[in-house]
Structures are given as C-alpha cells and as structure tokens.
C-alpha cells in the first residue's frame, strides 16, 4: 500500500508539473503573438501617409532619424498604452528645426532626447521614430508611450490653431489605431510634474478641452 501511495503521489506530482509547464508555454506563446501583433500594427512597409490620411490622420512627413544611441536607440516599445503631449520649449523653432536637432544628437552627443512626432507652427507633422520603437521623451513612460512634441511661437507655450488642430487629429488617429481612450492621452507633466506642455499645465481647462 505504501508503494501504491508513493506511486500515486509521484504520478500526481508529474501531472502538476506537466500542467505548470503547459501553462507557461501557452503564456509565452500568447506574449509572442501579442508582440508580433504590435509589430505588425507598426510595420510601415505596407502603409504610408496617404493610407494614414484615409484613416483620419493629418498628413505625416516621415523623416526617420538615423539609428543612434542618443535619439533613436531602436529599443522596442513594450506597447502603446499612452499618447504623451509635449511642447518644445524653444519658441519659434519649426518642426524641421526640432527634427534636425534630434538627428544632430548622433554627432553632438549633448543629450538623449527625441520624439515620435513633431507638430509644427503651421500644423505640419514630421515623424522621427517608428511607433514600434521607444523615444527619449517621457521618462518612465518611454517604454509604453508614443510622444508628440509641439512647436509654439512664444514663451506662453500656447499652440497655434494649426498646430492645435493637427495635434488633436494625430492623437485621435493614434488612439483609434492602438485602441486607446482620451484618458490615455497625457501630458509630460502627468508623468514627472515637469511644466510641459507649459500652457496646458498652466491652464488645466484648456487641456481638458483638448
């Protein structure tokens, strides 16, 4: 009887171990499938500005940065859980100026900073980094957020109407694309307490309206 009980216990233990292994394998497969789905969603091979516009996006000028450790490290985004809105803090600079600054960091090495998109003073939108990759913009949320830098004319940080309209349209399109809600559109301020985007930190009602 002891031998039978021992054999039964061993059998039960083997069944439990087998069950745990199967669950772990299935979990790993689901994670891989999820990652593959996210990468497919972000694959720019079969998509472009015209396709995106048909889906509700503003025109996006794709000027991807040269891979480098200071502005485009090519680290994978864990997932798009947030859309983070920033202001450039350099009044009068254009979207192209800011994009070129990010690009030049590969040479100057003065900082690690970048953004997925930059929206200009006239509403133009430049994409600097694929949405499947991480940007250096939102501190602890770099790993799971898509960042939008916004140009502004003066120190108040208020967006021009053209800039505002493009930001709203771009954020709405990204929300639709990644299944997000307006609650997942955040300010840099909401992550770190930094006064960014300045006008929309100083005027919470304007942020809520946006």
Which residues are covered by each model-predicted region?
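Second-shell loop/turn segments in exported
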Residues: 71-72, 114, 150-161
């Amino acid at each position: 009887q002891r031998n039978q009980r021992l054999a039964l216990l061993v059998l039960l233990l083997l069944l439990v171990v087998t069950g745990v292994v199967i669950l772990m394998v299935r979990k790993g497969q689901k994670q891989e499938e999820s990652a593959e789905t996210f990468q497919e969603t972000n694959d720019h091979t079969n998509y472009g500005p015209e396709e995106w516009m048909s889906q509700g996006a503003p025109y996006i000028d794709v000027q991807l940065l040269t891979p480098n450790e200071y502005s485009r490290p090519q680290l994978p985004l864990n997932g798009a859980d947030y859309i983070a809105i920033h202001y450039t803090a350099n009044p009068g600079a254009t979207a192209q100026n800011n994009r070129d600054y990010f690009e030049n960091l590969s040479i100057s090495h003065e900082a690690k900073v970048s953004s997925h998109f930059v929206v200009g003073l006239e509403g133009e939108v430049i994409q600097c980094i694929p949405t499947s990759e991480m940007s250096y913009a939102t501190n602890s949320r770099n790993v799971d957020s898509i960042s939008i830098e916004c140009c502004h004319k003066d120190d108040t940080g208020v967006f021009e109407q053209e800039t505002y309209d493009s930001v709203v349209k771009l954020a709405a399109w990204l929300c639709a694309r990644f299944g997000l809600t307006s609650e997942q559109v955040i300010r840099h301020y909401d992550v770190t307490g930094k006064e960014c985007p300045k006008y929309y930190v100083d005027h919470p009602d304007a942020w809520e309206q946006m």
